[in-house]
Amino acid sequence: MSNANPFFSQSLAERDASVRGAILKELERQQSQVELIASENIVSRAVLDAQGSVLTNKYAEGYPGKRYYGGCEFADEVEALAIERVKRLFNAGHANVQPHSGAQANGAVMLALAKPGDTVLGMSLDAGGHLTHGAKPALSGKWFNALQYGVSRDTMLLDYDQVEALAQQHKPSLIIAGFSAYPRKLDFARFRAIADSVGAKLMVDMAHIAGVIAAGRHANPVEHAHVVTSTTHKTLRGPRGGFVLTNDEEIAKKINSAVFPGLQGGPLMHVIAGKAVAFGEALTDDFKTYIDHVLANAQALGDVLKAGGVDLVTGGTDNHLLLVDLRPKGLKGAQVEQALERAGITCNKNGIPFDPEKPTITSGIRLGTPAGTTRGFGAAEFREVGRLILEVFEALRTNPEGDHATEQRVRREIFALCERFPIY
């Protein structure tokens, strides 16, 4: 159907060259740089198409079949697809796919299962936890009596004995298991036993490892936790958003009320469409193969870095991320993040357990393999990336402000590598 109204026919390039130009520059950046930020990934064209669909026009407050607006027949269809697919993916009885983010999903659980002033026990930020798990600057750290567990100073592994001791002493109403920067598997069964021993609810935030769990390469927290939250991006390779799972019908009712009307109004139906597509992709055998490559690539990258004299927190990784301790190289996280970006490699500065540096400086960086694996990198490519990272490290040791010649040479090699594995 032709439409003479330019409002509906003009492209972004025709209507807003400034925004279009910024998007094109971001596309070029993604095409020409190696993305090692562990929380980032690259979505499929199908997910992009779903997010750019006319569903962005639709208000759909409420839930499928129980909306507060008319005209929701097809919004219901899309949300029902997302719900059924994510339930199959994680073998869950109930799912809420409306949270706009992982933080919103976590907030909904706390609203549903805890009262202001209740004691909440989560992993400390400096040990690898997330802001929303009770860190002081976050809402969870302000509204609740938030206590933090950490890792062993000797092994850098999660200290389950400390979790148990804190739980026995303080009797939290909610225990949170999950992380933002922890490279090892979690023992969900032990967390549940600790929670049961003090009458607490167990929430697992699986945001970073949701894809690994979906592929069956990590224990499924749905089998142990009262409630599970996640983002839809990261290893799950979907749009930016969140969801909540539970097998408890009463908790499911509380979660639904906490998401809407408790925290949010209308759901973002175009994002939920993208979630449905990504969940469908994650149900395939191809996705399992992808996750196997993500894990193998993390091992390959870690092996090269360790061979080059770099310390990895806990000595390695069981998942998609590596936490690099830069102190043996005499380097800082912020310094390395900037140098690597100049060289065409993006990562993030990250505190390490018991870090003496400020969060804006840090003694470490966090690296991840999901995005590079999505574009087709295998172990050989990640070994090459590791070698180039080491070259930047060594140049920084000689020239702490940055070695332009080395960074530009590495950037050319990175660009050539990316050209072999194009995106979009």
Curated annotation (Swiss-Prot):
Q: What is this protein called?
A: Serine hydroxymethyltransferase 2
Q: Which GO terms describe its biological process?
A: glycine biosynthetic process from serine; tetrahydrofolate interconversion
Q: Which enzyme type, at the first EC level? A: transferase
Enzyme Commission (EC) number: 2.1.2.1
Q: Which PROSITE patterns match?
A: SHMT
* Name of the gene this protein is made from: glyA2
Q: Which GO terms describe its molecular function?
A: glycine hydroxymethyltransferase activity; pyridoxal phosphate binding
Which family is annotated? Belongs to the SHMT family.
Q: Which residues bind (6S)-5,6,7,8-tetrahydrofolate?
A: L125, G129, H130, L131, E250
Which organism is this protein's natural source? Burkholderia mallei (strain ATCC 23344)
Residues modified to N6-(pyridoxal phosphate)lysine:
K234
